[in-house]
Curated annotation (Swiss-Prot):
Cofactor note: Binds 1 Mg(2+) ion per subunit.
Name used for this protein in its record: Enolase-phosphatase E1
EC annotation from Swiss-Prot or TrEMBL: 3.1.3.77
The protein's enzyme class: hydrolase
Keywords: Amino-acid biosynthesis, Hydrolase, Magnesium, Metal-binding, Methionine biosynthesis
Pathway participation: Amino-acid biosynthesis; L-methionine biosynthesis via salvage pathway; L-methionine from S-methyl-5-thio-alpha-D-ribose 1-phosphate: step 3/6; Amino-acid biosynthesis; L-methionine biosynthesis via salvage pathway; L-methionine from S-methyl-5-thio-alpha-D-ribose 1-phosphate: step 4/6
Swiss-Prot/TrEMBL GO biological process terms: L-methionine salvage from methylthioadenosine
Cofactor(s) recorded in Swiss-Prot or TrEMBL: Mg(2+)
Its job: Bifunctional enzyme that catalyzes the enolization of 2,3-diketo-5-methylthiopentyl-1-phosphate (DK-MTP-1-P) into the intermediate 2-hydroxy-3-keto-5-methylthiopentenyl-1-phosphate (HK-MTPenyl-1-P), which is then dephosphorylated to form the acireductone 1,2-dihydroxy-3-keto-5-methylthiopentene (DHK-MTPene).
Entry superkingdom: Bacteria
Gene (name only): mtnC
GO molecular function: 2,3-diketo-5-methylthiopentyl-1-phosphate enolase activity; 2-hydroxy-3-keto-5-methylthiopentenyl-1-phosphate phosphatase activity; acireductone synthase activity; magnesium ion binding
Taxonomic lineage: Bacteria, Pseudomonadati, Pseudomonadota, Gammaproteobacteria, Alteromonadales
Pfam family for this entry, one: Hydrolase
Source organism: Shewanella sediminis (strain HAW-EB3)
Amino acid sequence: MGIRAIVVDTAGTTTDLSFIKDTLFPYSAKALPDFLKENEHNVLVENCICDVRDIALEPEATLERVIEILQQWVAEDRKSTPLKTLQGLIWKQGYAKGEFTGHIFPDFIDAIEGIKQQNMRLYSFSSGSAEAQKLLFSHSDAGDLTPNFDGHFDTRTGNKLFKQAYCNIINTISLAPKQVLFISDVIEELKAAEEAGMRTLQMVRTPGQRTGTYKQISSFAELTF
């Protein structure tokens, strides 16, 4: 059964981890307090604030307390949906202002054409919000790459470390598990995808990176179908 869709992780796979950690995260952490104060009555932001209170079990938390909670989650790199949604909204402003462009590895940019020529579908799956993924790929160093994607999955689909998230992706795109290839640098994600029946490849871009028993590539140029 041939591969008909490729699902790619972002950080460490299509995008340099340092761009996420050294550019995007610090930018959102610095902008977060003012952004919440200026937009607390925006419906989407208001919903995120309510979700933070619910998750933290602090229904009466003030806005200042919500900001404290979010900053703690940033420090802990929590994969919380309201945090990821707010980060995406903040990054949207940063991209629009030209504060930065989205880093994408050149080998992935080059591989996209071959993937589409094979009539394969292309999806991304990240703990960052789908909106943040669209921003990354639409404001990339190589321009707007989003027309090449058939969809983006985030924490609303499920936790990347658990099988159910990948089962949900398979159900959403209506393909057999073995028709889907998942590429990530994280062993635990590959394990979960494999448990769901997907084919897997580990992206190994850095020396000393944790590796397992999965087939490995160090560049999208090594993809063969």
